[in-house]
Amino acid sequence: MHTLFIVLLIIDCIALITVVLLQEGKSNGLSGAISGGAEQLFGKQKQRGVDLFLHRLTIILAVIFFLIMIGISYFGL
């Protein structure tokens, strides 16, 4: 049981890191904050397609991560 939780945790961590790295950046960095940052503030657009899928998958994988960690600590593994 302990090995199963650890393997699931490792798979979830690798998937979570991969999904986060696949997402596009939401800001232009420091240059976007200094000049032209208001465009993002007022021109906020809804996510569509792949961006929306990656965003939702990130949330799902994060919830699974925390559930596995709670399971490991609850069962004292």
From Swiss-Prot:
Keywords: Cell membrane, Membrane, Protein transport, Translocation, Transmembrane, Transmembrane helix, Transport
Example GO molecular function: protein-transporting ATPase activity
Domain of life of the organism encoding this protein: Bacteria
Presence of the UniProt keyword Membrane in the record: yes
GO CC list: plasma membrane
Family annotation (InterPro entries): SecG
Location in or out of the cell: Cell membrane
Protein topology in the membrane: Multi-pass membrane protein
GO annotation (BP), single: intracellular protein transmembrane transport
Membrane-crossing segments per the record: 2-22, 57-77
Purpose of the protein: Involved in protein export. Participates in an early event of protein translocation.
PANTHER family tied to this protein: PROTEIN-EXPORT MEMBRANE PROTEIN SECG (PTHR34182:SF1)
Family to which this protein belongs: Belongs to the SecG family.
Identification of the protein by name: Probable protein-export membrane protein SecG
Gene field: secG
